[in-house]
């Protein structure tokens, strides 16, 4: 810095990484570089990733569901399925909250009544068939066959693209609290 020289990334300069990412010029395209890294990994050759993974805390899995026939199951998606018009104005990306919508008495989710507002994928197929995100039709079949006790009367939805970890954890805490209070002991979580 004192010499007013360009400061390069930590992997070149040897300082502790700060988490900042910089645009860099490379002779090879990203596709070529990642293919070379993948081949090195597959052939057990030494390699260095360009984007190291952050360490995340370990989350213990939920207890095993012993008897599905006595279980109320909730449905949740990060695919952004909402009633047409997005009445709660959920964000298409970088979500800070989630929606909770009644499915009480419904056997299916109809095209034109629900739509996906997710900003990270082509939502055409999900909007044309909402069961791709919330499989209510199949769950009602399982309920009618006695294979599960019931489907929870609401489904939950948000858009998972770009949501930060702390916000996700807070939403998860609120959801878990709501589900426990409602007697729900299992959930099906779909993602895109």
Give residue ranges: language-model regions:
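An N-terminal assembly and electron-transfer interface module characteristic of large anaerobic redox
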Residues: 1-192
């Amino acid at each position: 810095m004192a010499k007013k020289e360009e400061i390069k990334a930590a992997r070149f300069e040897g300082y502790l990484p700060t988490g900042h990412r910089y645009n860099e010029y490379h002779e090879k395209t990203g596709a070529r570089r990642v293919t070379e890294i993948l081949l090195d990994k597959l052939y057990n050759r030494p390699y260095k990733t360009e984007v190291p993974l952050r360490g995340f805390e370990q989350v213990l899995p939920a207890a095993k569901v012993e008897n599905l026939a006595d279980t109320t199951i909730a449905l949740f998606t990060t695919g952004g399925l909402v009633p047409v018009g997005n009445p709660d104005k959920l964000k298409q990306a970088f979500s800070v909250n989630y929606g909770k919508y009644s499915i009480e008495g419904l056997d299916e989710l109809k095209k034109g009544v629900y739509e996906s507002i997710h900003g990270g994928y082509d939502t055409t197929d999900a909007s044309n068939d909402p069961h791709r995100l919330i499989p209510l039709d199949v769950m009602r079949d399982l309920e009618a066959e006695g294979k599960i006790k019931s489907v929870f009367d609401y489904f939950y939805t948000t858009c998972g693209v770009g949501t930060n970890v702390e916000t996700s954890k807070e939403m998860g805490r609120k959801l878990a609290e709501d589900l426990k209070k409602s007697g729900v002991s299992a959930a099906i979580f779909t993602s895109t």
